[in-house]
Amino acid sequence: MEKYFGEKQERFSFRKLSVGLVSATISSLFFMSVLASSSVDAQETAGVHYKYVADSELSSEEKKQLVYDIPTYVENDDETYYLVYKLNSQNQLAELPNTGSKNERQALVAGASLAAMGILIFAVSKKKVKNKTVLHLVLVAGIGNGVLVSVHALENHLLLNYNTDYELTSGEKLPLPKEISGYTYIGYIKEGKTTSESEVSNQKSSVATPTKQQKVDYNVTPNFVDHPSTVQAIQEQTPVSSTKPTEVQVVEKPFSTELINPRKEEKQSSDSQEQLAEHKNLETKKEEKISPKEKTGVNTLNPQDEVLSGQLNKPELLYREETMETKIDFQEEIQENPDLAEGTVRVKQEGKLGKKVEIVRIFSVNKEEVSREIVSTSTTAPSPRIVEKGTKKTQVIKEQPETGVEHKDVQSGAIVEPAIQPELPEAVVSDKGEPEVQPTLPEAVVTDKGETEVQPESPDTVVSDKGEPEQVAPLPEYKGNIEQVKPETPVEKTKEQGPEKTEEVPVKPTEETPVNPNEGTTEGTSIQEAENPVQPAEESTTNSEKVSPDTSSKNTGEVSSNPSDSTTSVGESNKPEHNDSKNENSEKTVEEVPVNPNEGTVEGTSNQETEKPVQPAEETQTNSGKIANENTGEVSNKPSDSKPPVEESNQPEKNGTATKPENSGNTTSENGQTEPEPSNGNSTEDVSTESNTSNSNGNEEIKQENELDPDKKVEEPEKTLELRNVSDLELYSLSNGTYKQHISLEQVPSNPNSYFVKVKSSSFKDVYLPVASISEERKNDKILYKITAKVEKLQQEIESRYKDNFTFYLAKKGTEETTNFTSFSNLVKAINQNPSGTYHLAASLNANEVELGPDERSYIKDTFTGRLIGEKDGKNYAIYNLKKPLFENLSGATVEKLSLKNVAISGKDDIGSLANEAQNNTKIKQVHVDGVLAGERGIGGLLAKAEQSSITESSFKGRIINTYETTAAYNIGGMVGHLTGDKALLTKSKATVAISSNTNTSDQTVGGLAGLVDRDAQIQDSYAEGDINNVKHFGRVAGVAGNLWDRTSGDVRHAGSLTNVLSDVNVTNGNAITGYHYNEMKVKDTFSSKANRVYNVTLVKDEVVSKESFEERGTMLDASQIASKKAEINPLILPTVEPLSTSGKKDSDFSKVAYYQAKRNLTYKNIEKLLPFYNKATIVKYGNLVNENSLLYQKELLSAVMMKDNQVITDIVSNKQTANKLLLHYKDDLSEKLDLKYQNDFAKLAEYSLGNTGLLYTPNQFLYDQTSIIKQVLPDLQKVDYHSEAIRKTLGISPNVKQTELYLEDQFAKTKQQLEDSLKKLLSADAGLASANPVTEGYLVDKIKRNKEALLLGLTYLERWYNFSYGQVNVKDLVLYHLDFFGKGNASPLDTLIELGKSGFNNLLAKNNVDTYGISLASQHGTTDLFSTLEHYRKVFLPNTSNNDWFKSETKAYIVEEKSTIEEVKTKQGLAGTKYSIGVYDRITSATWKYRNMVLPLLTLPERSVFVISTMSSLGFGAYDRYRSSDHKAGKALNDFVEENARETAKRQRDHYDYWYRILDDNAREKLYRNILLYDAYKFGDDNTVGKATEVADFDNPNPAMQHFFGPVGNKVGHNQHGAYATGDAVYYMGYRMLDKDGAITYTHEMTHDSDQDIYLGGYGRRSGLGPEFFAKGLLQAPDHPDDATITINSILKHSKSDSTESRRLQVLDPTTRFNNADDLKQYVHNMFDVVYMLEYLEGNSILKLDTNQKQQLLRKVTNEYHPDPDGNKVYATNVVRNLTVEEVERLRSFNDLIDNNILSSREYASGKYERNGYFTIKLFAPIYAALSNDIGTPGDLMGRRIAYELLAAKGFKDGMVPYISNQYEEEAKQKGKTINLYGKTRGLVTDDLVLEKVFNNQYHTWSEFKKAMYQERQDQFDRLNKVTFNDTTQPWQTFAKKTTSSVDELQKLMDVAVRKDAEHNYYHWNNYNPDIDSEVHKLKRAIFKAYLDQTNDFRSSIFENKK
């Protein structure tokens, strides 16, 4: 055959394309057959000529060259293809599509060798202009001469008008052959070349690639796509391809020859959609004619189009449709399969006849036919008998035939929608409206010509004519982790994807599967779901049928509606009907080749899902045996993607929608040859494309392996609504404006429309269904009422079959029950009438049946004296949902074998679940309770009080809350609050508790089993487990019993007793067994767990300290022993109780669903959360698309959150179209974001496509108009006033209780301002209203109005305390509305907010925020506590950020975290989440931190008003305004000042504890890692404050620091006039300020109080009799100033040589460099004492030279006094300094006499009593010669401090000072009989002589000996004194005179002079005496000391030679 020269038809016809309509007005242009060869751009375009030939025109020789496939790629510069068609019937021939008007048609008839009236042709040329691919598309209408072209070698006369020329780029995909009415395409002949079979097969796979023909509905003629974004039925035949760059390139659509002008498509999509909307549900059967009125298929042109077409006033154009069917023979082919190993030969498929069903749309104007066009063509392509020959390990797309495009033309049932969705971001549209393929799109590669070059990996991208990627309805393909779809890999486009006779199936717009532009159908595919079920396989079989074995069944029926996708949509079989080849082979192929998720639906597949249920597996299977699970049948509705999506393969790895036949997995290379392609999880794209192509060719190969037998119908699983995992059903009715729940019915109501059903689920939110009918039925001799609820598309699975609507039964309520009860209301009524009767439960009862008033205390008011038994006929029953105690009182009653489930009881007085009180030998046995009790007084899990009554073999499990602040006595217990009386017994029972309490006084008790056990009551053989968090430390709290003491009698004999009990309870502020210890307690065999955390804040030695409590621990067992001990004590097993009649727990079982894969069970569960309301078949369908590499396959999905970028979306209705991201939150805190794109609505659910996954997502809410609800409730809510009585009543407070400490007033106002938006979110997040109904809406209105105060309080509370972010994601809405975030999908945000608001004043107090989360929110969120929840959020949104870093970035507080300079410490401090971390968040969330409630206030600070300083041992908090004044005004000045000083303060605190770390041993060092609270005073200045602010602010103060932090934290600091004070676990600055320098010294003082006993003193504690102040001031505290003349250690301040005070400095310059270890400290003090002892010796000698009177003036005597302490001990010395008598003076003859007579200087030690625990310092230059000791106890404060330092100099800190000032030798003292009574206990008494003995090992017998030895040691070195130069104090200071000496004698002379002067002046006794000025001795000693201090570099060396 010769190539016809330049066959380029250039006839043009301007017309507006509407859906399925060829404009009647076409300007007829007749052109002669003058076709000059088109010019080729510099981009090497090639001329491709399509000549249309009837098979009758072929010679037998030519028929042998026929290739039964579709041309694929441009190979040469100039190519001619003869496209061969077979005539279906003469009738069909008679009318070819007419594009002209009636008059024009008459004119056109002339000269047509074929009676064709106006043939519509697309001429397409592609060119690249300014980097944009532009397709010039012209509709050429013409006939006759203009088209008659003589063919030299092969004549084509009959179809000459269809000839078309294209200018394409080499390697580009070829356009698809056109659909010609009355003809069936069977193959092609390429001029001058014979195509090998292998090529043919390859081409099949790529068939879809040619221009995508518009596929008209393949399934149902009458159905029209009405989705605005999807293009509607496109006139298939004409569109050759044009506007889509991709269409020519990657037309993976089955045969869509479509390609319509983008602009026209747009018009079609808009106009036609409106016109066709009415006909959406109409279904035309074959040959059925519909009148224009019946099918409101009215198409109109835009005025401008009408002008173009020559017609301005266009009459109404109507149409009807008819169906025609033609059979197609099959042939035999041999294919090379790259998927098969070389040498392997197999029969790929047996031949099978195909058939072609065409739906012709006949257009008429004024009842006269003006034209007709093929709306859709459903081709079951013949399956050629294909023999495969393996060439390598690649899959030959020959199998694609199976998936091959059935038909390039529109398949029947597919609605071709010309308009491409413009919003698709994937494609750029050029100025011509043609899509510009973006090179970045992975799906399509654009050649230099701008044409998409098919890439093996991007089969998915199909660009619509508009240049926008067509959306594929969520093609089954899954690209969660999909590899990029490769266009060439088109898995054979599943031929079967569209049902062959899809015409019957109305295709539904893309409701079901929103296409993700990037997904497989990427560009151009639009997936639409058919609303009707896909027809049987035979009809639906399309290329996709064969796709994967399982795929066809589900996918079939879906057709590509996109013009460009015209390639057969999945679901159609393009194979000729005649193919007799057996389908068995195709089945195999399909099975063998998993579909690549990315393929299949590649371009143009439009997945249309039928809404009917999938047929049973056996029915759905095609010849291939297995039907592609879900994809088959899905067809792309997009113009460019008409190709059928490949059916999903069931193979797990191919999550793709389209299943590829064996070869389908291969990608098609540019030349059309298949290349092996790894199974990408989703091969939908390729499959659909290629399979479509093959099918479209009609080649036998085209059949997909899964293709069903032509005679069988494979139905896509019908997508319906299904309510799964139903746990309970509640029936409500509206009567007289009141809603009532019905547990049963008495009769059939006359007005069922006033009823609705609340369907509760164990996994999903409540759904409200309107009741359609209620009828009475008799079953098993019982009268039941059948309740039927109806909602669009809702079905219910009953006995493995689905039935429309939702039904359930309620029992008939017995008019009266006397003994056996099945109704709670009847039970309550009966007992109230006769409280002494015997009652049995005959069913589990629901307490919701009875509503109580707000003031009612119990359900049964009178005292019950009868019997209540919860067991009947061997079944155990329960009462559910008690809101109040069941009984008020029990007296002599019996209650047994009863369970109380889900109690939620609250009350202001004493409460218990079963009863408030039981007395008079009431017996409670085998009663089990679970739930929550909250109150303000006594609480018991079963009883608040049990007097002379017993509880046996019973249990409680749940939460008990009473954090109410009151001084009233109360008792709280896990089982019973107060157990009292000698007959009272609790035995063989257990409690699992979480108790939150706030005991304030000793008569408030809390116990894991009982609070108070007194008057001989007993607890035996029982145990408690769980947690007790008691905020305050003054109550009696313990794991078993709070108190056993009988307060009534005060007699230990009548106390309560414990026998064989165990505590496995973590207790804060309490003990393990009992909360109060006394002698002779009646306890026996008590046990506790070592693993429990039992911390007690208590009063120890005059101080409040927090430490682990080992008191009342009983026998401590290892954690491993606890379980066995519990079993031994009490092997209690709880009974199994019957659920409520309306309850049930049935998880979704997917195993019975067709195509279920066991290994995907988790995946189905995950998809279930993405499609919460869809039926199981649909879930399985999409579950099979999930890639095995995807998190959706591997991890449990907890929740899905819609977002717009980084903003959480809750209001779905308002943001339906703007949502663009879906956050998937998986278990283990994993998450991922997928692109989200709205597709359409289905049954009031918004459907979205998910990224490139091919998956669907629907929010967990139905779309309904919330406006009416909001309008009704908003006014009422707006009227609520924060200070109203209604609010107070809701809070439960009296008028005189302030609401201040809620700190909600400002937020309350803000919340009201934003109420409308909040209500939209709330209604969206809450129960699903499946149908707009005044009854269900009224129920919500009523609930909101009735609880408006509580709702506002709850909403305000959460908006106030949870308004913070993680990065860019604010979590407020997650906390408020997305309660399912952590996997608990059935919580109601509305109910949660209301219950939170009703939880009471105490629960809503800001300071209780941590407990409030645990009490009111944790269970609703499915979490455990606040901090684990915050961490989970952080791990999801900021996985690479630590908790602390996130916290610091979010809070507006100024945080300084100062790590140690010691490397090992610094390293530990960087360990996040450990006790070593100095991260503020880590520390304040620690379990041992008292103020964990700081987290939320700090996270929500609105401004910078608070600073935080964190160092090794402390955590400080202060307000900026504490430093605000006229000098530091608000703003930058204040901020800079505070922040600079905060940094400096942090460094000082760091240095102080670095010092201590260096000198302590390892054990003590470990204890330095702690968390002492530092608080600056609540004193706030303003810009006018002078100096320091002094006024104390209270919690009402408006200061921002108080309002937003200090107040909400609730630490009511007691302010006083001190500089600061410590409590043992905290330091409070009062007069001093934390950031000042004196605040640093205060820090060392107060921290000594918090550190001495357990850390500084080695854990030995303070020595008995020494008060806390002894250890701070004058001993371990740093000196106040550098020039302090005291014996102290500077451990905190760094001084500088350049300081102004340097000349006077007497303390260590820099402690960080001076003290590197304990030896350095000892060396410093020892060397310092070298100077001290020497100077004291010199002074003493000088004084001895004076007369008696002078000596008396200069010296005093220190003595001891003894005063009894509170325990009567008279052993603690009090130092008294007094003047000497003459006699005493006269005894002072030698230096040692000064020591022996306890002499000290009068210069700085005034006469008087130095009280114990005083603030005294030891003077550096005022000698204490005395060695006064206390041999019967503890030294006085003066002598104690001095001797302590002397021991430090002599023996060091650990070996000298610590033994002296601690109780280190207490045990030795006790052994020696030295004891005292302390706090009722006998303790060892350490005496001075014992210390002397132990420290010096009997070296000295008296302290005088020790002291003399110390002086002597220095005297012995006087001759080696180092030379020193010092200020000459005898000269005026202005002279700066110096004196140098190395002679002690010279120093002695100087001292003599100085002493004499002082004696002469006699200043020592003056009141205003100042030694620095008035004492010559002081000045001399100071000068010498300072000189030696400097000379020795802070005493790093001695003042004596050769001594260090």
Curated annotation (Swiss-Prot):
Residues 194-213, 235-305, 373-394, 422-720 are annotated as: Disordered. It catalyses: Cleavage of Pro-|-Thr bond in the hinge region of the heavy chain of human IgA. Residues 1-42 form the signal peptide. Residues 276-296, 485-511, 574-591, 700-720 have a biased composition (Basic and acidic residues). Its EC number is 3.4.24.13. The active site is at E1646. The modification Pentaglycyl murein peptidoglycan amidated threonine is found at T99. The keyword Hydrolase applies. GO terms for biological process: proteolysis. The Gram-positive cell-wall anchor motif LPXTG is located in the N-terminal part, in contrast to such motifs in other known streptococcal and staphylococcal proteins. The protease could be cleaved by the sortase and anchored in the membrane via the two potential N-terminal transmembrane domains, whereas the propeptide located prior to the LPXTG motif would remain attached to the cell wall peptidoglycan by an amide bond. It is a multi-pass membrane protein; Peptidoglycan-anchor. Binds 1 zinc ion per subunit. Its main location: secreted. It is found in: Secreted, Cell wall; Membrane. Residues 314-393 form the G5 domain. Residues 197-213, 235-246, 516-529, 538-572, 618-639, 648-681 have a biased composition (Polar residues). PROSITE patterns: G5, GRAM_POS_ANCHORING, ZINC_PROTEASE. Residues 155-2004 are extracellular. The chain crosses the membrane at residues 106-125, 132-154. SMART domains: G5. Residues 43-99 form a propeptide. Residues 419-469 are annotated as: 3 X 17 AA approximate tandem repeats. Zinc metalloproteinase which cleaves human immunoglobulin A1 (IgA1) in the hinge region, rendering it less efficient in coating the surface of colonizing or invading pneumococci. Strongly contributes to virulence in mice. May be responsible for pneumococcal infection and is potentially involved in distinct stages of pneumococcal disease. This is Immunoglobulin A1 protease. It comes from Streptococcus pneumoniae serotype 4 (strain ATCC BAA-334 / TIGR4). The gene is iga.
